[in-house]
């Protein structure tokens, strides 16, 4: 392949949800609401955990605060571009912007997978080894596990990105069935045989998501099996239910997209909305609605701030 041919394509056209202006205007309002909800919900959890002494010292809530930060970052990788594209007929993205988006999508996404696995281990220790919980899940270990999650995401994303940028792109340049740059649809546009690359990438992304999901489900199953009393099992199920809901909402779509041979389907676009937009929006609701301690801390935060504002007014 001639070098000039491989450098012809320096931009991609993303697939939108509609070409009808009135429909796109409605979708813009809907996704703007989703994105604002993501910011409000996740920032509120981070502020609540940081301002409450009990929550801030608890390993579970320390990890929850980090999960909220990852959710915020994850949605920000794709949603602002999506909102802007509702006003752009061509929905254009440069090659460099595409690679950057792809890198951070897999960086933050993989880090969140690893962190959810860490949170499952935290619940296992808390429920099955309660007497050793504070010793095992020390703040130092929590920081190491969070850092390891970020590092794991970075390594995973670096591998995916390096494999992608070494491919020649000379046309076509229409990224099918997605509103952002992701590995499966982008490498389909390469002017080369990508079979081996696809196997490597499926092994990378597919195995990470599938193995993490299996480990998570196994952890929660072990928790329920080890508890003998009905009351203890009921409490454990109540505690784990929110985690299981988050895990299913996030891992289900990811496994569907990444743990298969690289072929695109029309449903991929809607599946991508689930783990890029809907899950980060629902996570704060799932964790706060079922958690009395978080709700109580939020109420204290509102009361404290309300009293502060009243003092400032007087």
Curated annotation (Swiss-Prot):
GO molecular function: G protein-coupled receptor activity; olfactory receptor activity
One GO CC annotation: plasma membrane
Residue intervals annotated with topology Cytoplasmic: 48-61, 120-142, 218-236, 290-314
Entry's transmembrane regions: 27-47, 62-84, 99-119, 143-163, 197-217, 237-257, 269-289
Cell compartment(s), UniProt: Cell membrane
Gene3D superfamilies linked to this entry: Rhodopsin 7-helix transmembrane proteins (1.20.1070.10)
Glycan-carrying positions: 4
PROSITE patterns recorded: G_PROTEIN_RECEP_F1_1, G_PROTEIN_RECEP_F1_2
Functional description taken from the UniProt entry: Odorant receptor.
Family to which the UniProt record says this protein belongs: Belongs to the G-protein coupled receptor 1 family.
Protein name as catalogued: Olfactory receptor 4Q2
Species in which this protein is naturally found: Homo sapiens (Human)
